[in-house]
């Protein structure tokens, strides 16, 4: 009998029903009782096992990005970037790397409509020969706050009222009135792009600045951009209401059906590159996650293409248990000093350990597809077969040794130990620049969304005045139009 053959897998299903331990089940309908009317006997092991398993079927949903859909495919390098990075998966045009991608909404629960106004998650896990690289981004290039100290409050303000469980504008506008840097993200959040028609027709962004390092050790800051080959398409508020009322899973269905029909979604990957010596040449901090980099100065460079050509086999195993972490990088890619990115490195792994368990990286969808070895051992639900006698390092009985050193950015950091804001906040300029690129009808939809939100009866005159001041500092005309429709006199 081959004891290694029958590992847990549907590939080894028997033609008849069994318990988890493999014992035969001859009746899956009737409980074991005393007589036909009962009571039920506790010795009905299969009944107890079936109910106990059902009670534990679900895991805690993600605190953000709970509603999502996943698909598999590949990333192919199309342009040579070896002068910028020594990353193996980017080593030459034509190199392909298997990936799994997850799209999501951010704020609402697992079963919420995919048609609601929200930022969308756009996360890609590259299964490279040097380990997993997780590019965990969104469909907008900026975020509401630049410091993770405010992140829990940011999410709570966006989520439903803890008393009524209703998402309310007064809570959102109250909290973010204390974060003027959030206006740039609102220029996306209240814009058409946060009502994408589906996942296939939206952009993706790495959001944060990272670093690319070449073989010589030269580092450049980098931002990642995903551009859909089928173009960007959004819905109006009215269309979103109609679509959500018809099918609350419309984007998941569209993604699944498109792949099943052979109409594979595709995105082009572009990067922006900045020399670290140029960081101080801008009127904003390039490592501030509330800012974008000007494309006229730092143009988009093509790198490769992402193609999703396989649907997942099991939603729970490959979507609910799929775990991303910005801390997962590979040689040739490194973090920047972005404050929010630095804290996400800890927070994502921490939430996965809580949500899935300490051995979540052993799950097939999360495990690297290359040889790997460490002495992280045991723990709840560990299922890795290990037969070593040495579980420590260094050892003269174990040939395992540290890996070859690869280049990482080296720089001298100086400063006082203090809690403070960055010197170049420049909170409003880019929000105004974005607004002025729109056609009048798009500007009007943006203004209407502000008027609707600020008309919430619990939004105070003080809060309205603050937001009109912010909008006016971004674009005087925009602030005046919102103020006039609210019958509020602008302060600027």
From Swiss-Prot:
A Pfam family hit: Catalase-rel
Catalytic activity: 2 H2O2 = O2 + 2 H2O
Name of protein: Catalase
Main location: cytoplasm
Gene3D superfamilies in alphabetical order: Catalase core domain (2.40.180.10)
Membership in a protein family: Belongs to the catalase family.
SUPFAM superfamilies named among the record's database cross-references: Heme-dependent catalase-like (SSF56634)
Active site: 65, 138
An example Gene Ontology biological process: hydrogen peroxide catabolic process
